[in-house]
């Protein structure tokens, strides 16, 4: 199949390898709740990056592969090893080979790895592509989707043994994450998510009445 090209917001976008990559992630994103973040996140990057000049191939690849190291079958099963696990370092090691098998442009791999290295809120993105990905990933941790992603980890993630652990994480997110957004577009997108997030926490506190456990 010849490489299909289109132009969106001034960016040259290729599609030939994308279906292969998305299918690889769909099959590897386990447990099942690990899938869904990737297509939602990519859709968010298009909104966050609207009007900016950037390489969408780089953002797409990083979006689908940045969390490779948190998938079952890729991360350690031993709880002590898992507590020390660096999922970013794992992804940086494995992603070049995966992209090569998908037929991705090898000249863009370094840019993809830069996005993956700096996609977390604590990181300092060094490119417009990594800034877009990081902002979009922060947005995915806020609002209704952010709440669902956190609560589904209770009893399945070593960080969330109880509902109180999840509530504390959600409270920390609404306090700390909005201020880490770099782009004005991201801040605008965050407003409704922040409202939903705060209303949920207030309702949770009222209904649990100190008995969330």
Question: Can you name each region flagged by the protein language model?
Answer:
Residues 103-110:
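Short, flexible active-site-proximal loops enriched in glycine and acidic residues
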Residues 55-56, 108:
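Membrane-helix interface segments
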Residues 41, 85-101:
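An active-site-proximal "capping" alpha-helix that borders the catalytic cofactor pocket
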Residues 56-76, 87, 91, 113-122:
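His-Asp-centered metal-binding catalytic motifs of divalent-metal-dependent phosphohydrolases/nucleases
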Residues 77-82:
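Short glycine-enriched, charge-decorated loop/helix-capping segments at active-site entrances
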Residues 20-26:
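Short glycine/proline-rich turn/loop motifs
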């Amino acid at each position: 199949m010849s490489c299909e090209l289109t132009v969106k917001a001034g960016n040259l976008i290729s599609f030939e390898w994308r279906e292969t990559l998305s299918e690889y992630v769909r099959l590897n994103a386990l447990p099942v709740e690990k899938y869904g973040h990737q297509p939602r996140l990519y859709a968010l990057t298009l909104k966050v990056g609207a009007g900016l000049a950037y390489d969408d191939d780089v953002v797409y690849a990083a979006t689908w592969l940045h969390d490779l190291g948190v998938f079952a079958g890729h991360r350690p099963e031993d709880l002590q090893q898992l507590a020390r696990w660096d999922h970013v370092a794992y992804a940086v090691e494995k992603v070049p080979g995966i992209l090569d098998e998908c037929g991705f442009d090898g000249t863009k791999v370094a840019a993809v790895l830069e996005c993956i290295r700096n996609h977390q809120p604590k990181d300092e993105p060094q490119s417009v592509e990594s800034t877009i990905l990081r902002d979009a990933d922060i947005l995915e941790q806020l609002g209704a989707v952010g709440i669902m992603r956190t609560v589904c980890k209770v009893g399945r993630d070593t960080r969330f043994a109880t509902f109180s652990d999840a509530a504390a994480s959600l409270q920390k997110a609404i306090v700390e994450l909005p201020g880490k957004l770099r782009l004005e577009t991201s801040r605008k997108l965050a407003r409704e998510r922040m409202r939903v997030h705060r209303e949920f926490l207030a309702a949770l506190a009222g209904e649990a009445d100190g008995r969330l456990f």
